[in-house]
């Protein structure tokens, strides 16, 4: 096993740990989930570049008769990238005392101001940061608003 294979195993393990945390652990942290809403995905250009570069590496490894272990590891990395970028949907998860947005816990008392933009983006102003929440279904904005008003 080469150093390249070890690095690939490390990256695959990191992506797998992130996927498991995002899917199974985060919804169970900080109490029961009151509301979980699907968000719009950001641009997919980065993901296309990543999966394309991994596909080029697989092609190079196969055509140069590289190690089969490396080919399998690159394929696993491409599948993990495909899952994280295209199959998994980003979510905002509301709890009793706060919410998870982009895998970061934010308590309700940190919200200083809330606005709704013309194009349906909920803007939350925190102490030093502004959150732009783009929901997939525009009707979910009312649910978010009611939940935050009830819990503040």
UniProtKB/Swiss-Prot annotation:
Could you give one GO CC term from the UniProt record? plasma membrane
Broad class of where this protein is predominantly found: membrane
Membrane topology is: Multi-pass membrane protein
Q: Where in the cell is it found?
A: Cell inner membrane
Q: Where are the transmembrane segments?
A: 6-26, 45-65, 67-87
| Claim: Cell membrane is one of the keywords in the record | yes
Domain of life, per lineage: Bacteria
Q: Which UniProt keywords apply?
A: Cell inner membrane, Cell membrane, Membrane, Transmembrane, Transmembrane helix
Indicate whether NADP appears among the record's keywords. Answer: no
In Pfam terms, one family for this protein is DUF986
Q: Which InterPro entries match?
A: DUF986 (IPR009328)
Q: Which family does it belong to?
A: Belongs to the UPF0266 family.
Output this protein's name. UPF0266 membrane protein YobD
Record the organism.
Salmonella dublin (strain CT_02021853)
Q: Source taxonomy lineage?
A: Bacteria, Pseudomonadati, Pseudomonadota, Gammaproteobacteria, Enterobacterales
Q: Which gene encodes it?
A: yobD
């Amino acid at each position: 096993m080469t150093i390249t294979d070890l690095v690939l195993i490390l990256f695959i393990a990191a992506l797998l740990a992130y996927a498991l945390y995002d899917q199974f652990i985060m919804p169970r942290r900080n109490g029961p989930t009151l509301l979980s809403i699907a968000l719009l995905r950001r641009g997919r250009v980065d993901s296309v570049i990543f999966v394309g570069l991994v596909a080029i590496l697989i092609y190079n490894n196969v055509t140069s008769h590289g190690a089969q272990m490396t080919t399998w590891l690159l394929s696993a990395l491409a599948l993990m990238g495909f899952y994280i970028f295209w199959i998994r949907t980003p979510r905002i998860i509301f709890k009793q005392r706060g919410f998870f947005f982009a895998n970061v816990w934010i308590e309700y008392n940190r919200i200083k101001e809330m606005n709704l933009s013309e194009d349906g983006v909920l803007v939350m102003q925190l102490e030093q940061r502004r959150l732009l929440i783009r929901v997939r279904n525009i009707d979910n904005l009312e649910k978010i608003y009611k939940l935050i008003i009830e819990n503040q």
